[in-house]
Amino acid sequence: MKQSKLFAAALTLMVLVALIIVACAAPPAPTAATQEAAPAAADMRPYRFVVVSHGQAADPFWSVVKNGVDAAARDMRVTVEYQAPQTFDMVAMKQLIDAAVASRPDGLVVSIPDPDALGDSIRAAVAAGIPVISMNSGSDVAKELGVLNHVGQTEYEAGYGGGERMAAAGAKKAICVNQEVGNVALDLRCQGFTDAMAAAGASVSVLAVELADPVDAQQRITAALQGDPEVDSILTLGPTGAAPAIAALEAMGKMGEIKLATFDLSPEVLAAIRDGKMLFAIDQQQYLQGYVPIVLLTLYKENLNTLANPVIMTGPGFVTQENAAQVIDLAAAGTR
């Protein structure tokens, strides 16, 4: 079943790459008369898209999304406006979406962290005839809201992929460190990880921590390891969870002995992977979450192209010791 899903994802990406090549293709060479009448600005497509996300472009994660949006706007030769509330504020985000719909753009890209708060605004966009692509969050509700496609990572599948890799590395008993038990997305990450490990004959327990207190998180991880010497592996659900795990293992002298992996990237995580202290990071490739929706909207407006898969998966991608140095350079360039 998992192989078929991976095949479907690979096929979707192959089709998407082909469509991008077509969309990026230069227009036919103009005649001399046309060159004189058509300045460079005329090469711009007449489309204006609006992106509304719950994350600010100044945030390290979302700045990479914004870079993807900007690159796609250049490549597709379209106008794109990127908007976000100043903080994580669903009331403000709803207002931004409503204002975007009122401005009648040619397409809308939204993240959907809270479908209860944003659903009516997204439905209003669809009802107004505005094509909508969702990205990053909302894969489970995008279709029912009328969204054409969702571009992002399905959390269960990402966790499952992490579990497969951890089990392949020889892990038999793991801890999934969850900083927000009850957060559906994070719970799904642990569940996918648990199911993949179980399929390989390994077991997982969930450890709740509070990342507002990194020292306490480190102590909880240390206590869990001391309380069960059979634990041989740890998965954290983000870089802020990886940091106290690294600190705990280093303090116990078990770095490298107990396998460690995490979701998402940070300079500390990338350095640890490069140096062989961590096995891998599960990368949702947020640059693609910014880039691909602009391509999809352009192709939809220009040629009514759609992709059959409701969710275009940008992850899980994996950063390992083999590619960490390259990813470090790409992260410095703002594309990873």
Model-derived segments and spans:
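Hinge/cleft segment of the Venus flytrap/periplasmic-binding protein
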Residues: A32, E36-R45, V181, A196-A200, ...
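Hydrophobic alpha-helical segments within soluble ligand-binding/sensing domains
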Residues: D43, H150-A174, D216-Q218, L265-V269, ...
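Short, solvent-exposed amphipathic alpha-helices that sit
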Residues: P60-D75, A158-G162, V184-S203, R220, ...
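Hydrophobic alpha-helical
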Residues: V110-A127, F193, S205, L211-A271
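Exported/periplasmic ABC-transporter solute-binding proteins
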Residues: D232-P239, I246-L288, I294-G315, V319-Q326
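Extracytoplasmic "Venus flytrap"
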Residues: A41, P46-M76, E81-I97, S103, ...
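Flexible loop/hinge segments that line or gate small-molecule binding clefts
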Residues: P115-E157, A171, D264-R274, M278-L279, ...
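Short, low-complexity disordered leader/linker segments with a strong preference
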Residues: M1-R48, R74, V101, R123-I130, ...
